[in-house]
């Protein structure tokens, strides 16, 4: 099972490289990176569901132990996947996940 996930991820990365989705986006702040990645991914002809799975993993900082990381990823997969045919609604949903739903206090 784990091998299949690795194969899928490697396949997505290869498709992204072939169609010009640049790894430079990983150096942007996560919110901007995800928005940019989603646009580039969809323009490349890759399915929106695959983009939703790829972009948060590609763009979020390496510290995946944070609650915010898992909240953003879960929120996007749970709430935003249904907007796969509407880029505006998808972008708004991703923004809402980051700014409102997953705003975790560290106090």
UniProtKB/Swiss-Prot annotation:
Tissue: Stamen.
Keyword Disulfide bond: no
Keyword RNA-binding: no
Keywords associated with the record: Signal
First and last residue of the signal peptide: 1-23
InterPro entries, A to Z: THNL (IPR038975)
Top-level taxon in the UniProt lineage: Eukaryota
PANTHER family: PROTEIN TAP1-LIKE, THIONIN-LIKE PROTEIN 1
Protein name: Protein TAP1
Originating gene: TAP1
């Amino acid at each position: 099972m784990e091998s299949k996930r690795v194969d899928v991820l490697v396949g997505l990365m290869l498709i992204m490289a072939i169609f010009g989705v640049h790894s430079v986006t990983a150096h942007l702040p996560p919110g901007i990176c995800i928005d940019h990645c989603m646009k580039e991914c969809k323009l490349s002809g890759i399915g929106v569901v695959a983009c939703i799975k790829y972009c948060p993993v590609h763009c979020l900082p390496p510290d995946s132990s944070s609650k915010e990381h898992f909240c953003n990823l879960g929120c996007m997969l749970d709430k935003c996947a249904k907007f796969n045919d509407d880029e505006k609604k998808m972008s708004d949903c991703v923004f809402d996940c980051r700014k409102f739903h997953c705003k975790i206090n560290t106090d």
